C-alpha cells in the first residue's frame, strides 16, 4: 500500500462525507481521477463538471433547508403545547423563566444581555453565559426574532425563546453550526438598556 495515496483517499473521502456527497458512484469517481492523472480525454469538459457539481450542491442545500424547516415546524408545534409557552402571531415562542420589572427596550435601543443558544437537538452554538461575558448590541442589528422578543421583555427578565428559521437566519444559515432553515432556541437574560 502506498501510504500517501491512501491518506489522500481518506482525506478526500472524509471531505466528501462532510459535504453531503452521499450519492457518489465510486467507479465513476475513480474514472474521473484516473483520466486527470493519466492525461486522458475527459468524458465532460471542466466547465460542464463545474455546472454538475454546482447543481448537485444546490440540490443538497435545498433538501437540507427543507428537512431543517420540517424538523423546526414539528418542534414548534410540540413546544407550543407545553405549559407556560406563549406563541406570538409571528410564530415566535417564549416561556418566562423570570419576569423583570424594568423598562422594555425600544427599537432604537442598545441592550446588554446574557444568552445561551442551542439548536433544537440541544447542541450549543453560542453562549455568552458559558463565556461569562455579557453582550451588547443594537436591537436593529440582530436577527428578527431577537428584535421582536427583546421589545417585549422588561429589563431583569430571563426568557426561553424559540425562534422559527424565518425569524432567525432563514435559508442562509450562519457559520458551520447553524444550518440553513434552522429553528433556534435561546435563553435570553435582559440585563440593561445601555443607550440609543
Task: Go through the PLM ranges and name each one.
Residues 1-196:
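Cross-family detector of peptidyl-prolyl cis-trans isomerase
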